[in-house]
Each structure stands twice: as structure tokens, then as C-alpha cells.
Amino acid sequence: MVITSGNDSGAPIVKDDETAIEELRSLSDIILSNDRDILTRADDSVLELVEDKPYMIRRSRGYAPLPVMLSEESDINVLAIGSELKDTVTVSRGNLYYPSAHIGDLGDMRSIDALQDSVSRMLTLFETHPDIIVCDKHPRYSSVEFAEKLAEEMEIPLLKLQHHYCHVVSCMAENGDPGPVIGVSFDGTGYGDDGTIWGGEIIYATYSSYDRIGSIAPFAQVGGDSSAREGWRIAASVFMDMEEEISAVGSTVRIPAILVDPDVSTEEDVFADNSEQCIPDGKVFATKLGLCSEKEYEVMEASKNAGLNTVISTSAGRIFDAVSAILGIRRESEFEGDAATSLMYAAERFENKLDQEDLDAENSNNKDNESGASTGQLHANYEALLSEWRRFYVTMVSLRNDTIEKGISVKSIDIIKRLMKENADYVDDPMKREIIHTDILMEFIAIEAIKCGQSPAGKEMLSYFFHDILSDMVRHSVESAPRKFVEKLAEEFRDYLNKEAILMFQEILSIKTVALTGGVFQNKLLMRLTRDRMRKSGYKVIVHSLIPPNDGGISLGQAVAASHIYAENHRK
């Protein structure tokens, strides 16, 4: 017997017998009814434990609509509509913010009806009328269309706020920290201020303002909705960028020989020049790793170069999917989070083996047993991998700096700028913010995957390596991004610098609180590695507990930000 909620995948829970007969008869042979009416849908709450505290994944029965209390009273009441996936709504009164129970994904019209029910019930329950409605910025979200119509009907203002900023504010509000903080907001997708897809962001934030001060390296997400499920597309796109970049630089830098020939055994570098044999072939990498056929690669490359069915993205979620595909763990996801969670499980298996090796070594030392020849072999192999990585990373960063300094136009960068200009109010130049070089990390993992033949042991070690290095990249970028941001501000406003500006710069540079948020931080391994590294670097780390880090927490961030932005604007 399987007992679960009564609903189709992606649809809200069925509330009455008539709907159950219509929608659920194909799912079961018998429908057991009851004469007690269901007034309010209530999904099961789902949570994990992190440092002996709840870490919410889905906030619903037993937790919603318990409020989040802020220290400051607000004069306005807010209705926040949330995002598109894992939707919730939040209503506010004074200093209390009430997130609703889980509504679900709004791709199904039945979920829109459930959203309307939830809004009506929350407003009635707390006897409030909103002064303002707030929603996401994405122009094609059903939640945005719903909010626009509702604001028009209620004749009240509508405020649209950036997705990842609201993730950060949600984490701040739950922890009672008004900022400023440095937010690390990693998720699958969100509409960026520059018209591209964001998802791997470093954000300077307060309750009422934000600046994007860093991100993972932008990449072309080719294939529309398919690319959200098919990680191999993201990996192939990164290989295309690698080929274009080294081809553009020509003979000005040394590149690892294995980038030219994945089968090469030597560790020596070779000079890259304009001859074909010294330019890496992304297609060779993609086919050797079993990501796609030559034909699929060529079709995708043509689409990318033409900018067809292509968006520019900094999605951290898609990077996890790509690495999972590169390692042969999941070429594509069968369900949400499939590739990323499988990658995490592989990484955890390797970490457990490292821990066991440490334990065996400790027991061996306690018994004065010196015959354990294999003791420490995993650690030795991993240290060798880290040594190779450091060498590769320095070489590839030098290549990128050389490209920038010489003003060489790389084809993929041209595509990025063109797509930005077509879709955005402004062009957010990636060269003016801190970049987390996930592209270099994926290139290295691809090389190592080819070298180890995607063996089970190799997959596990490289899975852990990915989590380990990404967390270290985040630490480095959090430390570096404020400085780069201040340098950018000083350059832009050099003719207007005064004492107030200098004090603001000092405040930005002195921030020592980091918020880890977004659905990617449901990955407990990444969250722990990043949190521990930031703490060792002297940062206070705030994370979620009773509010989900995923899009289920967005509406809280929207409501808190909207109330403070509204109040600040009316004080001016």
C-alpha cells in the first residue's frame, strides 16, 4: 500500500470528491472518500537536520502559517505572491510576516486556482488588506501575471523584485539580520536585471537595496527548456567556449597538452598557435565522455553561434547537472534534482571512504601496527589531484587574463553581449564583477574523467572534488567581491567622492556576515563545506532553518524587502 497526497504530479492536492473522481481515477482502482470537508490544502512538511536544527525543504503542515517576527514595525501591509516553483505567498501586518503553506508549481492552471484560494484565505485569516503587492521580475511567470491582475483589481501598487535578492532577504529575515550582508544565492533559475538567467550570484544586500557583485562564469544555455533537464548540453556548451577562447588567444599562452589531445599521457605543456592540431576540439571532449553524438554537438553549436533557442545563464543548478553528465552519473535528469543529488551521493561516498581511512590509520597507530601499506592511499591520490588542479587553474586563469588584456574578441562573449542588449535595460559586464570560474573547474573535471575512464572510484573522487573546490571558490569570491565592487564604484563616481562615499566603501569592505541561500544549498555537503570554510575565514554564516532555502522562501523575502523599500521611498 502506498499512501501519498491525492494529486497529479505538479497539481495541487484535491479537496473534494467530484474533483477526485475526475482527476484521480486513472491513478487508482478505488477512491476512499470521507464526509469531512477539506477547507485548506496542507502538504506534508519536509525537513532535514543541520547542526541539530531543522533545515526546511517544504514548509507546510505543522509550520505554516507561523510568522517570522522582525524587530521593526512597518506601517504598510504587504501581499507577496512568490515565485513560479514551490510557490508560497506571504502576508504582513506590522512586524509579523506570515508565509503560507506550500502551494506548488504554477505551471498547472489548477495550481493558479490553489494560489487564489491561498491568497483569499490568508487575507481573511489575518484580517488584512494589502497596501502593496509584490512579485517576481520574470516577464513570463504565471505568478507575475496573477499579481498584475490582482493589483489592478485591488487598485494598489505592484512592485517587482529580483529573484535572488529575495532569496538573500528571506535568509536575513529568518535570522533577524537587517544587513548589510554578502549573500551567496545559488539555485536553478531566476530572471536577472540584465535580461539573462541568473542562478549563481554573490549579492551585497540590505533589506531595502542590493548590488550584484559576483557570479559564476556566464555560459550559453542552449536548447530552451530541455537544457534544464539535460546536463550534457551545459557541459558541451562549456567545451565550445573553451575551444573558442584558446583559438582566439592563439600562440600567446601555454596550455596543457591534454586540452589539445585528451589521450595525451604527458604532463608537459605545449604552445597553442593557430594550427588546428594545437586548438582543443570541444566535440572530441563531448563524444569521448559520451555526452552526445557529433551530429548533436554540431546542431547545438550552430544554435549557440546563431543565438537561437539560447539564453545566457549563471545558473549554479545547471553546473551541477553538467558535472553529473561529464562524470557519466546522469546524462540527463529523470526528475527534479536527479542529476545533482546523484552527484552529491557519489561525493559523500568518497568522503566516507576518506573518513574511514583516517579511522583505520588512527586504529593502526594505536596498535603500533606499521604494516598498513595501503593506509593513506586515498588521501595521497586526492592530494595529487589537488596539486594538478592548482597548476591547471593558474594556467587557465592566465589565459583568461591574457584574453582580456589583449582585447581579443571571443565569439561566445560577443553572443553574451548581444543577447544582453536585446533583452535588458542595461548590460551587466561580467568583467566588472567577481567571477567564480566554474568553467575552468568543469574543464579540469572533464580531463580527469577521460584520464580515469569514468571509473566508479574516479567518479566518486571527482564528485567530491567538485564540491570541495566549488566551496573554496565561493569563499575566495566572497572575500574578493566586495573589494572589486568598491573599485568599480570608485571608478564610476571618482568625480563625486566625498567623506560619505569613503565611509560607505569602508562599510562594504568590513562586512563579515555571509548568507547561504537558494535551492542548491539544499545540498548538505556543499552547504557544510562552504559554511565551514567561511567560518574559518572569520565570517559569521547565516543559513535557513524553518524557511526553505529554495523558492518556497521567496515570498518572505519579497514581503520584507517590499515593506522596507516602500518605507524608505516614502521617507525621501
How would you label these PLM feature ranges?
Residues 211-225, 304-308, 539-545:
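Short beta-alpha connecting loops at secondary-structure transitions
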Residues 2, 6-8, 12, 187-197, ...:
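Conserved phosphate/anionic-ligand binding catalytic regions in large, soluble enzymes, centered on
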Residues 164-186, 190-192, 231-240, 468, ...:
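Glycine-rich phosphate-binding/hydrolytic loop that grips phosphoryl groups
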